Amino acid sequence: MRYPASEKLEIIRLVEHSSLPVRRTLTKLGIPRATFYRWYDRYSGGGPEALTDRSPRPDRVWNRIPDEVRQRIIQLAIEQPALSPRELAVRFTDNQSYFVSEASVYRLLKAHDLIASPAFIVIKAADAFKDKTTAPNQLWQTDFTYLKVIGWGWFYLSTVLDDFSRYIVAWKLCTTMKAEDVTATLELALQASGLDQTELANRPRLLSDNGSSYIAGDLANWLGARNIKHLRGAPYHPMTQGKIERWHQTLKNRILLENYFLTGDLETQIAAFVDDYNHRRYHESIDNLTPADVYFGRGPIILAERERIKRETIANRRLQHRLQAA
């Protein structure tokens, strides 16, 4: 069976984000492993465009992006070098009300030496909790990560992340990793979400690892008094909390580019990054929406608007091609 490039890309995305091993995922999809890895090698070396089977027929030039639009895409890429082709395509569509695909952006940037080969990695371990969430505030993930302030030593960032939307509900930079630091962060999360004012029956569940602060009796008592059910991940399997683990890695990749000599400077940078992550960073796993879009329920409206923009853009390109050919 011959698959179009769009379906090959979708299959690769499914395998990347599957909680099952690669072999089992491919078996369920009915895709031979040799075929998948041939696609994946082409994708890793040339991006989405490399998945297209070469045809002797001429390209459909009617869908070519106009030169003026191409220049605007290039300018955005220069101004936002940290954005991937996927993120650039979504941001351009949202901000300019003009649809461009990830493959088109990748091809354009590649032609102008503005991109290297993509660093796509097939995920081999489960990165999602087994009971899927269906709405915000059903399940929160929490964990600590280490950050250093020169001359002051190590500090510990405690974070509460909403499982469904990836939204950072609350965070706190702590000097210890005690149960009281966990409860302080959770108190901030309850206040920020407004759940401190709701019925106890509507409180989220909490997912953590088995660190000493999370198995403490004081935390259990605090959670019990607030009707928050505590779930703990499987020992020696941190990918149960894959979303917050990836958040920590994303944070450190940005934050640790600089040295910090004052805790206030570190907190300022964390606050700025959390704001960017929540409100401006597009996540492929949530339909290229931002965590805030999903958490606050704006997703359906945004996705409907993108689909409208896509239809109008393609219709306009067809019309312009016909006018030029007449």
Where are these regions (language model features)?
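Short coil turns linking two alpha-helices in DNA-binding domains
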Residues: 32-35, 101
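C-terminal domain-tail junction helix/linker
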Residues: 2, 217, 224-228, 249-326
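RNase H-like polynucleotidyl transferase catalytic core
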Residues: 203-210, 224-243, 257-263
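Short alpha-helical "recognition helix" segments of helix-turn-helix
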Residues: 23-29, 88
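Basic, flexible linker segments flanking DNA-binding modules
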Residues: 41, 45-139, 237-238, 296-301
